[in-house]
Amino acid sequence: APAKLLASGCGDLIANVIAVKDWQLGHKKKKEYYGRYAADLALMSAEIVMENSSEFAKKGLDSRVIVEGLISAGVASCIAGSSRPCSGAEHLVSHALDKLAPGIGLHGEKCGLGSIMMAKLQGQDWKKIVKTLKNVGAPTTAKQIGLKPDVIIKALMIAQDLRPERYTILKEIKMTEKRAL
């Protein structure tokens, strides 16, 4: 598979770190079902990429490892009965970007960007996500995939409205233009 598509797959996998944290938040705040096995499987899928990203940077992306991670993430969603283990606020940002700038950037690239921003909001190690994405050759800025800053700001402001029933970190804050900056 082309390196760009594999890197995009890595962005989609890294998103699981954000999604699981959002799922835990939904469980805590809304008593939403939370399945530890599905969550752990989704996290393992992300961690395989994160732990091997330095190796990928040296030797190139290992398509088998990435595809296995994506399959495991899909299994985690099947076990959970929803996309919750693999789709949180970072995917809402990706979907908002799809709506505002259709056809620009690959799904996993936008999930990777969303993961950086949402990790910062969640208090997670966003710099580790940036490093991992760089190591696998995925974009870490909007400019790298052809998105303008105003589109990112608008996406952050509308993201939670796309799935109001899904509790994410975006429900915890009032996303304004000033905050999005």
Report each predicted region and the residues it spans.
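Carboxylate- and glycine-rich phosphate/diphosphate-binding segment that chelates Mg2+/Mn2+
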Residues: A1-R84
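Alpha-helix initiation and N-capping motif
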Residues: A7, A46, S63, E90, ...
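C-terminal charged capping/lid subdomain of soluble metabolic enzymes
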Residues: L13, G123-L181
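Short helix-capping/linker segments at secondary-structure and domain boundaries
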Residues: I18-G26, G81-R84, G103, L121-K127, ...
